[in-house]
Amino acid sequence: TVIDVKCTSPKQCVPACKAAMGTVRAKCMNGKCKCYI
């Protein structure tokens, strides 16, 4: 699931995904965070 959080590295997405979806599985794709459940 892509969330509206800008990123340059996956590490930036981990807290965002944890907050948004309760998952720490995150990637940075095309400058946006992507969370995996």
Curated annotation (Swiss-Prot):
Family statement: Belongs to the short scorpion toxin superfamily. Potassium channel inhibitor family. Alpha-KTx 02 subfamily.
Record site feature (Basic residue of the functional dyad), residues: 27
The keyword Disulfide bond belongs to this UniProt entry's keyword annotation: yes
Cellular component, GO annotation: extracellular region
Principal subcellular localization: secreted
UniProt-listed InterPro entries: Scorpion_toxin-like_sf, Scorpion_toxinS_K_inh
Notes on the domains: Has the structural arrangement of an alpha-helix connected to antiparallel beta-sheets by disulfide bonds (CS-alpha/beta).
Tissues in which the UniProt entry reports expression: Expressed by the venom gland.
Site, as annotated: Aromatic residue of the functional dyad: 36
SUPFAM superfamilies according to UniProt: Scorpion toxin-like
Disulfide bond positions: 7-28, 13-33, 17-35
Record's protein name: Potassium channel toxin alpha-KTx 2.19
Compartment(s) where it occurs, according to its Swiss-Prot or TrEMBL record: Secreted
Keywords carried by this UniProt record: Disulfide bond, Ion channel impairing toxin, Neurotoxin, Potassium channel impairing toxin, Secreted, Toxin, Voltage-gated potassium channel impairing toxin
Lineage start: Eukaryota, Metazoa, Ecdysozoa, Arthropoda, Chelicerata
Function statement: Inhibitor of voltage-gated potassium channels.
An annotated Gene Ontology molecular function: toxin activity
Keyword Transcription regulation: no
